[in-house]
Amino acid sequence: MSAQAVFPIAPHRADFFPRFVLSNSSANKCHQAMKDVSLHSPKQTPSKISLAYLGLVLVGMGIGAGGTFVLTNPQWADHLTNNSVISPLVTNQSIAPANESLATNLQSRLSPREPSNFVVDVVESTGPAVVRINAQKTVKSQVPQAFNDPFLQRFFGSQMPPMPNERVQRGTGSGFIVSNDGKIFTNAHVVDGADEVTVTLKDGRSFPGRVMGSDPSTDVAVVKIEAGDLPTVALGDSDHLQVGEWAIAIGNPLGLDNTVTTGILSATGRRSADIGVPDKRVEFIQTDAAINPGNSGGPLLNADGQVIGMNTAIIQNAQGIGFAIPINKAQEIAQQLIATGKVEHAYLGIQMVTMTPELQSQIRQETGMNIPVDKGVVIMQVMPNSPAAIAKLEQGDVLQSLQGQPVENAEQVQSLVGKLAVGDEVELGILRNGQQQNLTVTIGALPSAPPQ
C-alpha cells in the first residue's frame, strides 16, 4: 500500500492520485521496450507515446488518502425549484369508478413494480455480497532536513517545535464475498501493509478483517471476516468472454456505497505493458463501465450476475477506459493465497526487448551494443544468480523458441513463462554469434519485492 508499491493506491484527492505517466523522451525508448520476466518491479522508464501516457490510476482510494469528499454547487436543487413541474398523483382521467374505493386504487398504483431489466436482477442478487473495505496503517514521517540544522536548533533552543514522526494513512476500496464463511476477494493495493482492516456489508454490519495473503504481481488479495451465513457472489468464466457483451460494476467509488454502473466489455487480453504497468503478470479486461477511486477490488459482472473480473485501474484523463483482472486469474491466485498465504510465480531472470530496425540502430548509437538482428527477442540483461544466469544465457542472445514453440516478441515469452511452474525445465532455442544453440533452464521462483 505504499504510494510506490507495486500497485500504488489512489487517494481521495484527485491531485494526489498516483499515476503512471510516461514522457516522450527518445533517449530512453530502448529501456521502455524492455519487458521483464525476471524482477519483481522493474523501473518504468520513458517510452514512446502509448495509452500509458495518459496515466494509470488504481481505483482503490487506498492508504494515504485524506480529507472528505464533499458535493458542492448543488445545481440540481435550483433545477428542481425553478423548472420542475409536480404532477398530481391522480389525474382526472384516472379517477376510480364509484364502485372501487380510492384507497384500493391508490394502493395498486403505489405497489412496487417488478424489475424492469436484467441490471435490476443482477443488483438484487449480487449487491448484498459486495462490501466496502477500509484500511489503515501507521507510517513514519520524515522530519524536514531544515529542522536538523544546528543554527535553527540554537536559535529556537528548547522552544523548537516537536515534529511528529508517525502518521496514520487511511484508504477505501471494495471487495466481494466468495464464501459464506467470510472469504473476500479484493485488490492487493487496497490492503497491502495495513495495520487494521474493516469490512462493511451492505446491511450496515461491520467486521474486522484479516488479510490472508496478497500478491502484488497480480494485485489480488484475500480478506477474511469472522461471520457466517453470508451472501456470496457467483463466479463466472473469464476465458470465454466476448467483446461487446454487457458489463456491470458494483462498488464504493469516492465513498458512495453500493454504486452501480453499466457498460460493455471493450476488449480482452490487454497486456500490462500496454497500459503502463509492465511488472504486472495479468492480461486485463477493458470496460467502459464507469469505474472511479474506491471501486478497486469490486466485481465486474456479466448479464447473468456472474463475476467475470475484479475492477482495478483506470486511465487518468480519459473517459470510459477501465481495467479489471479476469476472474479466472484472480481465483487462481486467491486459491494459493488461501492455502499458503503466498504465491510463487515462474522466474527466468532476464530483461528482453522485441527488436526492430529502428531500435537496433538506436541501441547501437546510445550504448555501443551491436545487436546482430533487427527482429526477434533479444536479451538485454541477465540477472545475477538467476535461472538464466545459471543456464549460461548471455546479453545479446536472441531467443528463437521456448519448449520448441517459436517466439516473436517479448510479450509472448513472458506469457509462456508465466504459465510454467517453479521447478519446470524448459528448453530455449537461441542465436548467439550467428550460431544456433539449445539451452535448458530450470524455472525458479520470482523474488519477493524489496521493502518500499
From Swiss-Prot:
Function: A putative protease, its function overlaps that of the related putative proteases HhoA and HhoB.
Key words of the record: Cell outer membrane, Hydrolase, Membrane, Protease, Transmembrane, Transmembrane helix
Superkingdom assignment: Bacteria
UniProt keyword Oxidoreductase present: no
Membrane topology: Single-pass membrane protein
Regions crossing the membrane: 51-71
Matches recorded under InterPro entries: HhoA_HhoB_HtrA-like, PDZ, PDZ_sf, Peptidase_S1_PA, Peptidase_S1_PA_chymotrypsin, Peptidase_S1C
Up-regulation conditions: No induction by UV-B light.
Effect of inactivating the gene: No effect in a single knockout, but growth is inhibited at high light (120 umol photons/m(2)/s) or at elevated temperature in a triple protease knockout mutant (hhoA, hhoB and htrA). Triple mutants are not phototactic. No effect on the PSII repair cycle, even in the triple protease knockout strain.
Species annotation: Synechocystis sp. (strain ATCC 27184 / PCC 6803 / Kazusa)
GO molecular function, one term: serine-type endopeptidase activity
Domain PDZ, first and last residues per copy: 352-434
Family: Belongs to the peptidase S1C family.
Gene3D superfamilies recorded: 2.30.42.10, Trypsin-like serine proteases
One Pfam family per UniProt: Trypsin_2
SUPFAM superfamilies: PDZ domain-like (SSF50156), Trypsin-like serine proteases (SSF50494)
A GO biological-process term: proteolysis
Gene Ontology CC terms, in alphabetical order: cell outer membrane
Subcellular localization: Cell outer membrane
The protein's name in its UniProt record: Putative serine protease HtrA
